Amino acid sequence: LNYFSLNAEYRINKNFSARFGKGTTFIGNGYRSMLLSTNHTPYPYFTFITEFWKVKYYNHFTTFYDIYNSDISQKKHGAFHYLDYAVNNNLTIGLFEAIIWQSSDENFERGFDVHYLNPIIFYRPVEFSKHSPDNALIGLNIDYSFKAVNLYGQLLIDDLNINRYENTGDGFFQNKLAFQLGVKSQFSINEHKFNFLSEFNQAQPYTYAHKHPMQNYTHM
């Protein structure tokens, strides 16, 4: 049942649509994604999509299961915002944010936190106002195309402490970054069509992790 997927989409009108079911979602333009990928088993989700002018805006809500915990009653939830803006015919920029929190612990049954149903970017002020221990991440997605070539990249910030970075370097647990750089192209030679893709991905130590393991940005 872990690999079973079922997805549905309902278009309300030209500006609004909804997707829901059990599946996966991919954010990005490359082979992999440092923001949200499909490299895991399906999970329950609901996505509300708003489209207008040059903008696509996604509200994405999920239920995850911890990769190291075999007890499927131990759930965690995710709330995501992703804003995709087409600057022009060549350049698209996306802003990403996510909050991961555990459904319960030994003392408290929290469930899905309705504070994160806020449809407006940003989550960070909500988390701060609640004095929340949740796992917060932000990111950037860029795609630039010209002729038959696409240049793309991503940056994910899980945690960043500039003052400590100079003294402690990559291994400091409060400097958690991931990035992606890539290029892809389609071209023809003597009527034969070719696809080319080259991509580099890197994540700093402890990126996606959290001091409370159930709040790691992972799914089984």
Named regions from a protein language model:
Residues 15-17, 26, 45-220:
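Signature for the C-terminal beta-barrel architecture of outer-membrane proteins
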Residues 1-57:
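Well-ordered mid-protein domain cores that form the structural environment of catalytic cofactors
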